[in-house]
Amino acid sequence: MSLLTKAAAEAWGTYLRQRDERCEDAIRCDYGVFQFRNTVFQKTLSMLQGLYLRQYDPPALRTYVQRHQGTTVALRNPANWFLVMREQAAIPQIYARSLAADYLCCDDTLEAVGVLAVRPPDSDLTRNTKQAQELPCVLMLSHYGTVYVYDWETDGLYEVASDIKAFSKNGLLWCEYVYRHPQTPFATTEPRYHVQKFLCTDPTDAAAVAKTAREMSGLNLVIRTPGRTEVEPLLMLGSIEGLRACRPFDHMPAADFRDLLNFIRQRLCCEWYVVGLVGYYLAYGPFVPSGLVLLDKFGVVYLHKIEDSDLYRIADNFHMFLKCGLLKLRGLCRFDRGLRGECRLEELPVCHHTLKRDVLRWHGALGTITRSQLESALDWFLRPTRGTDKVPNNSSAWGRTDLLPTGALQDNQNWAFPSHSVETLPALQGGLWEDNDETTQTVDGQRCFRMPKFFPPPMCRVPYNECGVELPGGDSSDEDESGRPRRIANRIGDTPETPCNSENEDDTTVEGTSGGPEAMDSQAPYPSEDSPTTEKEAWLQRGRRAKAMHARGHTLKQVPIPEPDQMGDDGPDPGP
């Protein structure tokens, strides 16, 4: 019997500890749990009231943090996480750095209020001692009250809440680092046998994960996304042949399907593996996919969205995907330094700065909010009757959206009392924050740089850019003599690989480019490089290609995928 890897064993233990065999009605206890959640929200906000009352006064906020340095505050989602107050000068990873100018899409100022820590798990012998493990995450407040978390391990800045009230309600639900931590419970736990098979697989072995998916071909995983009550099916495929047999890919011409495989190979700069399709089922049977879930050779999980035919990173590995679901495409905002967001294939973060400034300006509150106003608002949010006079009318609010049982927060509040009694163990000081290479350099001074996309006529009759502005047509340099959009040229001498072998080479084989005219073109958008052996090498190749394409004015060619109304009753194109 083969031994499980350390990652698989930790994931398996976390999964077993979180299982609850009781029915859903018994778990949420109808009205009682909603009232209890309001109580937990009020207790969290009351512990953060010092930050709430000083969120628009940076000097007062800095003084407050210095005076309460070392104080431990219990947070939500997960409930066993804490905030340890610490001033910015005591955190070397952010000291003397301008995070707002290097990461955010708009000018702003960020003030550090402390680092995050986690209580030891139940199996830890030191759990009953007053010790907590610090994490490589810094909690920060912006000039407009927005809450951010800077993760120096992966050098990412996350927008976790629009204000402290929302942070008290949702906690760290929108912090990506939470779902990389081994103690975080899994959101996707059913069907039990399917999940167990994946948890026993090494998450960094993409071939093994794809093989497991292929063994379950035709079955569904129940994908749950934290903070959302609805579930989505993940139809397991595990092979390119299975993908070709599913709609709408079975109605794609053979040339377009080969272009799609080539596009994915070129975007990832390495070989890749099919996992399955996410979407929804119609009442009369057909499955309508919204995206293709796939892995690169390093085990990173991506989603190829059918809506815009592009790739987006959704998890660092499949175990993390079982924890966070599709959260990264449901509103999680990650800001990266320089070119790294494009190298990681992260979705472009949504800018909330202009909207919040406009809201404050419309209410006449831009730069004029006083402490007395905040005290009045706090008095209303902490009213004793909030748990009974704010009951939702819709049934969707009764779902289980907490990462841990709500009562765990009260337990950790008692454990951390008094606030200075908890000893914290320092986190690892190294991380990607120390990098200063090609991936961290800006492109023409642009913030949040992403490669522009070109939508071909079969997908969108009039192409538009990211801002909705109509692009020039006809004589555009993005089309060749035949009127077809110019594809991203392959690397010279490189034959794209597909780890999954095809039974029908006419339909699914990814054609090499060593004999084509594009491969011989000396103006290839990016130079020839060897296949990457590490994820960092793949990042460098993606960054170099993006800079070369940007310098030549090239755009990404989006392969058209048929919409349901464009598919007839005829079968797939047999190809040449």
Curated annotation (Swiss-Prot):
Residues 566-576 have a biased composition (Acidic residues). It is found in: Virion tegument. Residues 542-555 have a biased composition (Basic residues). The keyword Manganese does not apply. Residues 471-576 are annotated as: Disordered. It comes from the Viruses. Coiled coil: none annotated. InterPro entries: US22-like. Keywords: Virion, Virion tegument. GO terms for cellular component: viral tegument. Belongs to the herpesviridae US22 family. This is Early nuclear protein HWLF1.
